Each structure stands twice: as C-alpha cells, then as structure tokens.
Amino acid sequence: NINGHRKQAVEWLRALGIPVLRWPGGCFADDYHWRDGIGPVQKRPRRVNIHWGNYTEDNSFGTHEFIELCRLIGAEPYIAGNVGSGTPQEMRDWVEYCNYPSGSSLADERAANGSPEPFRVRYWGVGNENWGCGGNMTPEEYAAHYRRFSTYLRDFGDTRLFLIACGPGGNNLEWTRRFMEAMPRRTRIHGYAMHYYSRGRDHARRFTVESLRAQLATFWDLEKAILEQRALLDKYDKDRRIGLLVDEWGVWDRIDPEEEKRYGRLFQHITMRSALAAALGLNVFHRQADKLVMCNLAQTVNVLHALLLTDGPRCIRTTTYYAFELMKPHRGATAVRVQAPEAPPPALSVSASRRQDEIIVTLVNPRHDAGLDVECALSRGTAGNARARILHHPDFNAANTFETPDLIVPRDHPVSASGSSLRVELPPLAIVTVQARLSGV
C-alpha cells in the first residue's frame, strides 16, 4: 500500500487517466460531517451509515486521505457537501479548511494535520439527490437551500470554485423547470448535475436476452435526457453559464441476499453486459460533448458499476475498467460529428474524435445475435496506418472474477483503411476502438 491506499488499485486507476474523482457520496454525502474525518485516525468517531445497511463507518478515509488518493492517481477532487443534515457554516468551513492558504485557524488546523499547502479543491457539490435521500425536498425548497449555502462558499487564494447544484434523477424536467424558476440570475451556480441509473431486472450474472436488450436500450433514453435537460436549461440560461453534468451514472443490478451479507448492499457483479453499458454511455457523452461539462461513473471500487473489485488482498480489473481503457484515446481530443444508420435500440453505437492528424472511432455492437461489418466513411481526408482494439465475449453474463481475472480483456483486432474509409468487423457483444492516421484535411 501507499500510506494505506492499495498500491495495485492506485496504479490501475492512474493508468486510466481519471480526470475527476467525486466523494464522499452519494446519499452518504448528506449525512457526512467532514470534521469526523480529520485528525488522528484512532481518535476519529465511528458513525452509522443509515443509508446503506447501518454498518459502522470508522472515518479512517477522510478529507486528507481523499485528496492524497486524487493526487496519487492524477485526478482533480470533487467534494459533495452536506446540505440535507448539515449547515451553511459547516460547508463554508470545509471550503476554508481545504483552500485557505494560511493564517486562519482552519488553515492552521489543516497544516497541523499534515497538509500545510492548501488542497485547492475547485469542484463542490451543494448537496446530493436532495429530492430524495438528501432531504426529500421540493425543487423550491432545495433552491432556497442552495441560495443560502452558496452565499457563504467563497474563493480563497487562487482557487476559483465551481459550484454544482443538484439536478434531477433521470429525465425529470419538472424538477429542472421549478428549480430554475426559483433561482435568481445573480445566484452563483456553475454546474447542474443530473443522475442516471439503468436498473437491472435480473441478477447480474443471470440476465436474460430480454433483460439485456431492455437495459442497454436505456442508454438511448440517456441521450434523449441530456438533450432535453440542456434544452430546458437553455431557456433560463441562454449564455450557458451553467454547465450540465451527469455526476452519477451507470447500471444498478441485483444480487442474492447471501452476496449482500458478504459484500454489502451495493456490490454487484461486473459482466460483459456491464462493459457494453459503460461504452454505450461513454459514446453518448462523446456525441453530446458540447452539452456536457462532466460525467462521473458510479462508482469506482466494489460498488455498483465498478472499475475494480477487491476481496481481501486480491484486486481485479472489471470489464467496465477495460471499456474505459478502450475509450482513453478520446481524452483530450475534439469530438467529431457522426451519422449512423437508424435502427431500434439497442443497435450500433458510434462516437468519434480527432486529435491533430489522428482519428479515433469507438463502435459498440450491443446485439447478442448478429455481428456487424462496419464501414466508416470520412467526410474529408484519407485514413491510413489503422489499428484497433476489441473487448468481446460471446456470453453477456461472463465476468472477470478473482479466479479468472483475465477472462475478458482488450485484444488487438483487424481493421483496414483505404482512402476515405475504415472497415472493421464487430462480432456480437463487442466494443472496438479504431485509431488511424488522418491526412489531407
């Protein structure tokens, strides 16, 4: 380990190039009091996590540990503050503790706890799911809380805060409309975060074909939700001062009661289907990159649509991890508009981007019963030196396990480039990323 952080997990997460990491929740955020997680670990109080099984939270992972993890993996921290059971004073003090350079009592306390330099946390969520576990508020009630809390959240030193309001669960346009109508234009709000989960009908390892199709089709609904939420925000925010986020998204599947007792309520098996869902979601975000400022998978380790699973000393990369790995070449590139044949979902999903003289295309075939011979035609220029990687397994219930951790991993895949076209064959249940040299543009 590295100061208590599992070394293997740190190395694998750093390799993905994760840009932003969100913490401490989730529903837990609105019952979390930050002072519980600072100071000597052995003196930190133990609290009951009332949302997820009433287990004891020992607070050994607090603010300093979170910031250290972010630095180790190269991610910017995003902290979700407590609006549901907290106070404006508590959140205001947390910002000062993290960001004030030196000379105040809170900055001196941070230094005494081992961090003389400010953490420079830019991203702050003002509550989480306040329509539900974050306080069961109406849009108007939450808007009043947001106005009050945000009044006291200030920039310190050279850190300019990016304040994020709680948006709807799913495509709830009524929540957005009523919240925006209750917000005066002078209110400091930089981001608006919706959540989107695709709930599984079956146990994660026992999906039927019908359940597979139903779950994967929900990612076409995700794209519709992004378009409609952004369009509604634009009515109140014509200059797009407020960025749209999807700061919780992913699949949420069922497990057996005995598995819940062993691993916890939010554990789930990560299968080939999970990887397809992740890739479909990422393709949506790529296609709608001009309408989004941030998206955060739920979650990272051992919970829901996880990248990594651990069991004692063992740690494995899930198929979700490898879906993200295949998408990594798009990071830092510019989105390219794509047109694909229309078909009832789930169907072929495509996103593309360009980085200088390179074109990157990710294709997802979510069908279980048919392969696809795909030709990608470039509107300008020619392609050459093409290479491709594939993540594929013929069984959508197959998974990387602690016994077979490398069952499903990316492999090289044939692709051809000729003139202005790329050609690649996709077997059923496959994710392929193609990279090619672009010339003549």
Task: List the model feature ranges, each with a label.
Residues 1-177, 181-191, 219-223, 227-255, ...:
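Non-catalytic accessory regions flanking glycosidase/transglycosidase catalytic cores in CAZymes
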Residues 194:
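Histidine-centered catalytic micro-motifs
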Residues 197-214:
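Active-site His/acidic residue clusters
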